[in-house]
Regions:
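Amphipathic, soluble alpha/beta structural segments
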Residues: 144-165, 213-223
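Alpha-helical transmembrane segments of multi-pass membrane proteins, especially transporters
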Residues: 106-109, 130-143, 163, 167, ...
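Generic alpha-helical transmembrane segments
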Residues: 101-118, 140
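Catalytic-loop motifs flanking and including active-site residues across diverse enzymes
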Residues: 112, 145, 149, 173
């Protein structure tokens, strides 16, 4: 019950109205006529990426991929931060005030909910708690399993080595959740079990590499 209470408190930090406002930015100053250099435009106008994706299908996939990658890295960083506080601040900033919450479960879950809002907006879909109740419920339900696994693995591995699997699982769980949301909004269906398993295995490896890179930047002696 304490964890659910933490999630309820943390959810108040996520404002879908801000996502809707960002997605509604006027694009007159950004776009000429087609054909568009999608990568070049996104690089030159990153603050308009959500609005571009919402309005123009050509921009959706790269914008959604960037959202998934960014939030997955944020959650991996937070998993590292909870175990090794000095590993993060000088390299990255997690996107919001995570330190206010005692439960890492609450922080990681709510960051995924924020990702769900961003992906819905980029997909041209309605954004908000009421419109996305099913997706948000699935995020909350799925999150407890893989975060429990992360804690179990980290607890069985000597200090230092245990940081990598914890961060990798946080990364992978977030990444697969993002892929599932992307598929749902693009195709109207869920990923199959085989698709989830394959995506998870690939994402765990990506999460390991990212966590190792972060630790090497701050602690060169880390493996």
């Amino acid at each position: 019950m304490q964890v659910f209470g933490q999630i309820q408190i943390a959810i108040r930090q996520v404002n879908p109205a801000k996502v809707r406002k960002e997605a509604a930015k006027p694009l007159g100053a950004v776009l000429g006529g087609p054909p568009w250099d999608v990568g070049g435009i996104l690089e030159e106008y990153p603050d308009f990426s959500l609005a571009l994706a919402r309005s123009l299908p050509e921009f959706r996939r790269p914008v959604i991929e960037a959202i998934i990658r960014k939030v997955s890295r944020e959650n991996a960083l937070f998993a590292l931060f909870t175990a090794l506080p000095d590993a993060i601040p000088s390299i990255f900033e997690v996107g919001w005030a995570a330190g206010e919450f005692a439960s890492d479960t609450a922080v990681l879950t709510v960051n995924q909910i924020r990702m769900a809002f961003l992906i819905a907006a980029a997909s041209g879909q309605e954004v908000g708690f009421n419109a996305q109740k099913r997706q948000i419920g699935a995020i909350i339900a799925a999150g407890f399993g893989w975060r429990a696994l992360a804690r179990e693995l980290a607890g069985k591995i000597p200090f230092g080595e245990g940081l990598i699997p914890k961060a990798a699982i946080a990364y992978a769980g977030t990444y697969v959740a993002g892929l599932g949301l992307e598929r749902y909004y693009a195709m109207g269906g869920a990923m199959t079990a085989a698709m989830r398993e394959a995506a998870y295995e690939k994402a765990v490896e990506g999460g390991k590499q990212f966590a190792q890179w972060v630790l090497r930047r701050k602690h060169p002696a880390c493996p």
